[in-house]
Amino acid sequence: MSEELLQKFLTSIEQEDGIAEIGKKKKNKSAARRDNVKTILHAASKGQVQLSAEESYIVQKPSTSKGSDYIDDRLASQGFSLIDQARSFKPKDLKKRNLKYMKFQEGRRIDKKKGRILVQAHMQTKQDLKSLRKEKKAIIGVKEPRRLLPGQKKKQKDKSVFSDADFAQVAHVAKRINSMADHSFL
């Protein structure tokens, strides 16, 4: 027995190192069928295969499953086929819940005036929206005037230190151009 274990150990090490080739195991028919169904379902989820309208929900996992596979091979081996497993997770019919909600909403209707105001924003024409955009574009970047509180007086702008006569005098003075002789480079 120890020789057999030693031989198995050596072959597994050789297979990992790539020295010996791994022998392919033959699959039985049920495993092959199960793999075939899984590949078809996987292809259908990518849109490569078209399922009938009755079976299209099979492709999507139900939202109730928390990340775990809802198609179980163990159940398939017990006779509960993969298709039947997927059908068992078919979404519930929400008609009863929707009718109950509609009855609930009947007692909470909005006044016609309030309803018009709410819907009016959605019913604006393109022309109205364009005019609003133009107004916004004109306003953007314009500083809003400062509002004075009651009892406040508007501040007068600071006056310049120089008068207009000073500026006129500076403008008429002849400019002297410095010659190269005035500069020394060393």
Curated annotation (Swiss-Prot):
Superkingdom assignment: Eukaryota
Protein's UniProt name: Uncharacterized protein C26F1.3
Record organism: Caenorhabditis elegans
